[in-house]
Amino acid sequence: NILYTVRSNDIAMLVDDRLVVLLEHQSTINENMPLRLLEYVSRVYEQLIPIRTRYKKKAMKLPYPEFYVFYDGKDSYPAEKTLKLSDAFIVPEKKYLKKKNISLEILVKVININIEANNSILKHCKTLEEYSTLVELVRESKQENPDSSLEETLTKAIKNGILSEYLQRKSSEVRNMLIA
């Protein structure tokens, strides 16, 4: 079930008893993702939990959050990396953190889905692998022939079985996403 859409590419969904927040794709490296996802998950919890329930004496049971970012940008990036909100905190003395637990933490798993990153997730998820292949096709097409149309690239992808069913159904949406 989709609970909340932050932007057209951001999504939050319930899976079993967990709240999984996905940023479907990030084409630029953004070390502020933990902060942004903290904001997103706060909004999701606001929608899930009635106001009156938040003020009851007994603790609420909340869906467990997991945070993922799919990176498909051009800059070099490891196959997987964990970003931590606490890395952004201004702490007067580093030794303070050793003695005291951090009161607020968000861990974001950034997964590089570029074909050349050779991430194992692509072997396990055909759709994601095809998406990554499509992104690579678009890049190659722009580099080889800047005048070639996006339409030609999408037609080539469909002919090669790359997200063909999806591209046939949603070609205008995909075109708009790739142009943005």
What are these language model-derived features?
Residues 1-180:
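Elongated, amphipathic alpha-helical interaction scaffolds
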